[in-house]
Amino acid sequence: MIIIGEKINGSIPAVAEAIAKRDAEFIKKRAIAQEEAGATFIDCCASVPEEQEVETLKWMIECIESVSDLPIAVDSPSADVLAQAYKFCSRPGLINSVSGEGDKIDKIFPILAENKGWQVIALLSDDTGIPKCAADRLRVFDKIMAKAKEYGISPSRIHIDPLVEMLCTSENGIETNIEVISTVRERYPSIHITAAVSNISFNLPVRKMINLGFTVLAMNAGLDSAILDPTNRDMMGVIFATEALLGLDDYCMEYIGAYREGLFGPVKN
């Protein structure tokens, strides 16, 4: 499972405060903690006004790279910001994100065409918003993949995000997401499928239980990437266990290795 660590995001109040104060040590500690917990990428999202975003992301990326060798997921809703901010990374990472909205793809996919090491998250939304049914999301998916082919971007560099919605307000959200995930996986075996796991549990008590259950269901359907908190030991344990149960971990070697490294299970003194 590809783990995109979510803990350096300006929408989190403590992170927003650190950004405002330019508290580099706070950002660095979060980067180190996520790397030690088993993250694959470290997401970096400023969540500041767009006119401040490029400079803020530059500072955040410098903080992260000063203490971590992990690639960075450069995160912004603005394609113009992403087109500038990715250049601050000293090694290829992940652009988060594009969608079928406006001309975002035509601003970002040329960057990927020229920079072969970079990957991208593609959201299944368009100018109408988030489609309600699986068929409409898959139509957005087909358009994104047609553009990827046009720009020479292989499926293995794309992380499709089917857009997880709140369980308590979405009548058929789970069925829609599982259908989209399984269909995308069937059509493109080498593509990555990701999700912001915690979106599923907003406004529900004991959110962790919902998050864990959804992760198992989604992985069974074909999810192989997730935006989540890697320092959540229960979540990491469930991910390693599910990979083993799905036959993705020969002889449970990854599960055993992760346990020995202390990534899940009782905290070892």
Each language-model region and where it sits:
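Catalytic beta/alpha-barrel core
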Residues: 43-49, 70-78, 93-103, 124, ...
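Conserved, mostly hydrophobic/aromatic
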Residues: 34, 75, 85, 160, ...
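Short, acidic/polar
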Residues: 22-34, 104-105, 143, 210-215
